[in-house]
């Protein structure tokens, strides 16, 4: 609906860039559309805390960028957002504080940027988010670690 209010499920779906016919059966939606629908329903209730489990799964790059912007806005407005994800690029784009787990054990915690910058394994993802050039240099990492 083009006249849907911004805080409604239809308005939130439009904000996420997802066009879903109201009469469509949710089982006929793509995985990304279903995830966007669930998120829109959750947000329309205006919860004080938002829990997201692998929220970028099934989303295309554009929808992921929209979700990143929405999560940042919600956090800036004071909403607590707890995210479980394997998407390092998304975590780097929205996270302030991160807990890293391996085999069910907490192995590190700290600011997202510090944790990601401290591991060479995350260099490709960090390059996508933070590096001004297509190549992440030692100087880029040194600047992040300061």
Region locations from a protein language model:
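Conserved beta-strand-loop-alpha-helix hinge in the C-terminal portion
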Residues: 105-127
